[in-house]
Design a protein with these regions (language model features):
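Aromatic-residue-lined binding/catalytic grooves and analogous aromatic/hydrophobic interfacial grooves
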Residues: 8
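Catalytic cores of carbohydrate-active enzymes
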Residues: 1, 13-17, 52-54, 135-151, ...
Length: 271
């Protein structure tokens, strides 16, 4: 009755706009169901709440670890996509925008539906402006990550420069530029932002001596690089096309070489 994919099939059976579920419709050829999901959450994007409260706008009752749930803050303002379908007045603590938009862009890739891409263009541009406002306010081309991927309940980088969220935003801007060219919009700002992100990833977060990206760089203090990247850092970067072929080889070799491979043992293995 909701017309959207649930967050989980076994546990967490509730609607959520982003994370993984909405990729499945196009993979299975159910493009109509995918489009229904995207339409219902497009109706949940905030469009009439301008950003009137500046950074930082964190909740002091939660040790500043979450955004304050106040309309008009950078997070809860125009561009934000709310957690339930067809309801754009409900706050949630995740950044579900990032995966929802990535799923939508893959839908465009799968279907080649330029008419639909044209209709969703305002949603895409409002989202990209929202991401920039929230997660790259210093305009250095590298984005913070705030509860925005499947492993995200404990992933927040305190305004740091993060590989996986920067990679998502690279792909978002790169494809926005491509779509803009095809529908008669100006691709320049999106192409320039994608170029800036890729350059920053390669100059600040790529570790040539180790053959992979850093997890992130601290925003404060000594601005240290956190060099031991998680698996999600590698596959999100590759999926978002920020690597050249040799970088991709080196980064996947890092997983083979340095990430622990823990065997899964079942009763059949011990009998």
């Amino acid at each position: 009755e909701e017309g959207v994919w649930l967050h989980g099939a076994v546990g967490w059976r509730m609607p959520l706009s982003g994370w993984r579920a909405a990729y499945v419709g196009d993979v299975l050829g159910w493009h109509d169901r995918a489009r229904t999901h995207f339409d219902n959450y497009a109706a949940s994007q905030v469009t009439e709440v301008p950003n009137t409260i500046s950074h930082p706008a964190q909740d002091s009752a939660l040790a500043l670890a979450r955004s304050a749930k106040i309309w008009g803050t950078p997070q809860y303002s125009n561009g934000y996509i709310c957690r339930n379908p067809r309801r754009n007045n409900q706050m949630h603590h995740y950044d579900m925008n990032l995966c929802y938009i990535d799923e939508l862009l893959w839908h465009f890739n799968w279907t080649g539906d330029l008419e639909y891409a044209h209709r969703m263009w305002p949603l895409l541009t409002l989202h990209l402006a929202w991401e920039k406002r929230n997660f790259d306010p210093d305009n250095d081309g590298l984005y913070d990550a705030y509860a925005c991927i499947w492993a995200s309940d404990a992933l927040y980088y305190n305004s740091g420069a993060v590989t996986h969220s920067s990679a998502y935003n690279y792909r978002g801007n790169k494809l926005a530029a491509l779509i803009a060219e095809k529908i008669g919009e100006d691709p320049t700002p999106y192409r320039e932002e994608a170029d800036k992100i890729l350059k920053a990833l390669n100059t600040r977060l790529w570790l040539p001596e180790r053959g992979h990206w850093a997890e992130f760089q601290d925003f404060m203090g000594h601005r240290r690089l956190h060099e031991d990247a998680a698996v999600w850092t590698i596959y999100h970067a590759l999926d978002s096309d920020v690597a050249d072929p040799f970088q991709a080889y080196l980064a996947t070799s890092y997983i083979d070489r340095e990430i622990p491979h823990i065997p899964v043992v079942t009763s059949d293995d011990v009998l």
